[in-house]
Curated annotation (Swiss-Prot):
The gene is queA. This is S-adenosylmethionine:tRNA ribosyltransferase-isomerase. It comes from Salmonella paratyphi A (strain AKU_12601). The lineage of its organism: Bacteria, Pseudomonadati, Pseudomonadota, Gammaproteobacteria, Enterobacterales. Its EC number is 2.4.99.17. GO terms for cellular component: cytoplasm. Monomer.
Length: 354
């Protein structure tokens, strides 16, 4: 399959630079996987689409203020984007500079350059940085870091983004991008879903900056997926198996929840799914056999991205590309701060290719 098979025309005006004033008031395009039928509505329509006993699986990662600005002690300006926190003193990061720093380079970070750090090692495209500060890394990031808005949101981050670019149920710091399907859930909607009898479970996948990296090969089978840390604890496994046993659906909130659950299913030795704690490089594209997910809530993704490939593997290639064409025609808002989709599984998707 060619990367260009997953391309579509998107006017710049449809890229959302700010979220809706109310989280759950975004538009919702529903795609019936088996038939390809599309319906238009708002996000709160989920109350009618979900049944008592259905299981929603959320990603409870919390976005860290992962973008740092400063300079090398020798003078050159730098921008640091944290990929992951290694421990209380060290990070693994992307560094943008006129000349890549060498091991031993001292970095002065923050508006007042008061935070000192040292680049200690290089691992491919990533740099290991150690802070020379008594505070834990997370405290330093909270003090001087900027929210790492995606590159297609063409504006500086604002104070409001610290709340808006965060799910209301975020709990475990570590992501450098939000699991954006979850941004549409507010407390009243969550309460209404619970009252209806919808079950909820929480995985953790710390989204890395690699999620924004373009696919740089022509043939998608040649793409090497970036690695991200995921946790699928025993209580999530129990909730999934219980939902399946009673005939209810497992509904992933976002592609990161999909990748977490499917990673746990791939690693399982005996049951449908088993607990999973570790890095995953799972790459889902047409031809993949889904093992756990019955429905998916997700935002609209970039052309030629691994995420539109994941959706195509779930709903079917033709149904997915037709849904995106319709979304553009109907002026849905795209990407992280944009509108959402509710998609049910197409069992014929596994045999569909572009």
């Amino acid at each position: 399959m060619r990367v260009t098979d997953f391309s579509f025309e998107l006017p710049e005006s449809l890229i959302a630079h700010y979220p809706q004033p109310e989280r759950s008031r975004c538009r919702l395009l529903s795609l019936e996987g088996p038939t390809g039928a599309l319906t238009h509505g708002t996000f709160t329509d989920l109350l009618d689409k979900l049944n008592p006993g259905d299981l929603l699986v959320f990603n409870n990662t919390r976005v860290i203020p992962a973008r740092l600005f400063g300079r090398k002690a020798s003078g050159g300006k730098i921008e640091v984007l944290v990929e992951r926190m290694l421990d209380d003193k060290r990070i693994l990061a992307h560094i943008r500079a006129s000349k890549a720093p060498k091991p031993g380079t001292e970095l002065l970070l923050g508006d007042d350059e008061s935070i000192h750090a040292t680049m200690t090692a290089r691992h491919g495209a990533l740099f290991e940085v150690e802070f020379n500060d008594p505070r834990p890394v997370l405290d330093i990031l909270n003090a001087i870091g900027h929210m790492p808005l995606p590159p297609y949101i063409d504006r500086p981050d604002e104070d409001a983004d610290r709340e808006l670019y965060q799910t209301v149920y975020s709990e475990k710091p570590g992501a450098v991008a939000a699991p954006t399907a979850g941004l549409h859930f507010d407390e009243p909607l969550l309460a209404a879903l619970r009252e209806k009898g919808v079950e909820m479970a929480f995985v953790t996948l710390h989204v890395g900056a690699g999620t924004f990296q373009p696919v740089r090969v022509d043939t998608i089978e040649d793409h090497i997926m970036h690695s991200e840390y995921a946790e699928v604890p025993q209580e999530v496994v129990d909730a999934v198996l219980a939902a399946k046993a009673r005939g209810n659906r497992v509904i992933a909130v976002g592609t990161t929840s999909v990748r977490s659950l499917e990673s746990a299913a791939q690693a399982a030795k005996s049951d449908l799914i088993e607990p999973f704690f570790g890095d995953t490089q799972i790459f889902i594209y047409p031809g993949y056999q889904y093992k756990v997910i019955d429905a998916l809530i997700t935002n609209f993704h970039l052309p030629e991205s691994t995420l539109i490939m994941l959706v195509s593997a779930f709903a079917g290639y033709q149904h997915t590309m037709n849904a995106y064409k319709t979304a553009v025609e109907q002026k849905y808002r795209f990407f992280s701060y944009g509108d959402a989709m509710f998609i049910t599984y197409n069992p014929r998707a596994i045999s569909e290719r572009p």
